[in-house]
Swiss-Prot record:
Keywords: Chloroplast, Membrane, Photosynthesis, Photosystem I, Plastid, Thylakoid, Transmembrane, Transmembrane helix. This is Photosystem I reaction center subunit XII. The chain crosses the membrane at residues 4-26. The keyword Cytoplasm does not apply. It holds the Pfam family PsaM. The lineage of its organism: Eukaryota, Viridiplantae, Streptophyta, Embryophyta, Marchantiophyta. It comes from the Eukaryota. It is a single-pass membrane protein. It comes from Marchantia polymorpha.
Length: 32
């Protein structure tokens, strides 16, 4: 297994954070 660097972890966390925000906004628009 290859070791994951800190920069890769930050990028993954940012991408998950952004996608979760977009999903929440889309869900709110569809709910209303």
């Amino acid at each position: 297994m290859t070791s994951i660097s800190d920069s890769q972890i930050i990028v993954i966390l940012l991408s998950v954070f952004i996608t979760s925000i977009l999903a929440l906004r889309l869900g709110k628009e569809l709910y209303q």
